[in-house]
């Protein structure tokens, strides 16, 4: 992607879902598939519309084999996404909904480089692996505390420093990983 946000979501046999990966312009869809092996059954969603470059997968595989530069870039992306996947799995298991929502909103804000974007509560519930009522409650608490404004799918981050204080440690961990891999901090 050159702008926007994509998420990778894992779906269980009972239909429940959880986000297991997120990226903006630093990511590459299907990067794990370039390494070979079985197809990964996760689904990719565009969270925030943007632009992306597109190439048939077979052509990308060919270039991956030929180009050291592309291979290094893809391997860096895979390594980064692997670390983030692990952090998000721990986050979804160990942290309450409100700090997870704060973390997630900050990660989106960093990647779209905007403090305002559109997302439905149903979509947020899918990304957080939570019930819609849980997301409604968490978003209401963040809004009551003056950290966000939320109306009809439009989310505006009003106080990013306050939101960072509410966010679980996973936001800082993922942010530091991003800086280590890509040499540039992301800003909320």
Question: Residue locations for each model-derived region?
Answer:
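Short acidic-glycine loop/turn motifs at beta-strand connectors
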Residues: 13, 48-49, 151
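Polybasic "coupling" helices that flank or enter modular domains
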Residues: 48-49, 64-130
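Cyclic-nucleotide recognition modules
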Residues: 19-79, 83, 87
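Phosphate-/nucleic-acid-contacting segments
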Residues: 107-188
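Short, surface-exposed beta-strand-loop junctions and turns on beta-sheet-rich folds
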Residues: 14-16, 60-62, 164
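Structural motif
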Residues: 5, 50-52, 154
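Glycine- and acidic-residue-biased ligand/ion/polar-headgroup-sensing regions
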Residues: 1-14, 24-27, 44
């Amino acid at each position: 992607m050159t702008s926007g946000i994509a998420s990778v979501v894992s779906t269980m046999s009972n239909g429940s879902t959880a986000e297991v990966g997120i990226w903006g312009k630093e990511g590459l869809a299907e990067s794990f598939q370039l390494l070979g092996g079985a197809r990964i059954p996760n689904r990719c969603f565009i969270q925030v519309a943007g632009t992306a470059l597109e190439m048939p997968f077979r052509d990308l595989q060919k270039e991956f084999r030929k180009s050291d530069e592309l291979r290094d870039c893809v391997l860096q992306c895979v390594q980064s996404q692997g670390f983030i996947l692990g952090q998000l799995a721990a986050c979804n298991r160990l942290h309450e909904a409100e700090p997870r929502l704060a973390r997630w909103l900050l990660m989106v804000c960093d990647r779209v480089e905007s403090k305002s974007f559109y997302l439905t509560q149903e979509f947020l519930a899918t990304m957080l692996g939570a019930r819609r009522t849980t997301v409604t409650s968490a978003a209401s608490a963040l809004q009551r505390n003056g950290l966000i404004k939320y109306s009809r799918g439009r989310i505006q981050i009003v106080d990013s420093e306050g939101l960072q204080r509410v966010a679980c440690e996973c936001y800082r961990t993922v942010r530091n990983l991003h800086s280590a891999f890509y040499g540039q901090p992301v800003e909320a």
